A protein has these predicted regions:
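N-terminal acidic leader/helix
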Residues: 2-17, 56
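Extended oligomerization regions of viral-like shell subunits
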Residues: 16-65
Length: 65
């Protein structure tokens, strides 16, 4: 699965969560897939969620790592 697919699954599983964290290893791939660059605080908006870099060796999750 691609980073964007993993993010879609996480969002679908927890649609009320305001944020999503993506592992550092997948961050560049995810940003390229949605054709966005992080803003000044390092977040992007995808499907009305604030998406951030979750750090190395983490999962794609809606809960803060």
């Amino acid at each position: 699965m691609q980073a964007r697919d993993l993010a879609d699954v996480a969002i679908d599983e927890d649609p009320r969560a305001p944020c999503l964290w993506v592992p550092s290893e997948l961050w560049a791939e995810f940003c390229a897939a949605i054709d966005q660059r992080p803003n000044r605080i390092g977040a992007v908006i995808y499907r009305n969620k604030t998406v951030r870099d979750g750090g190395p060796l983490t999962d794609v999750t809606t809960r803060r790592p």
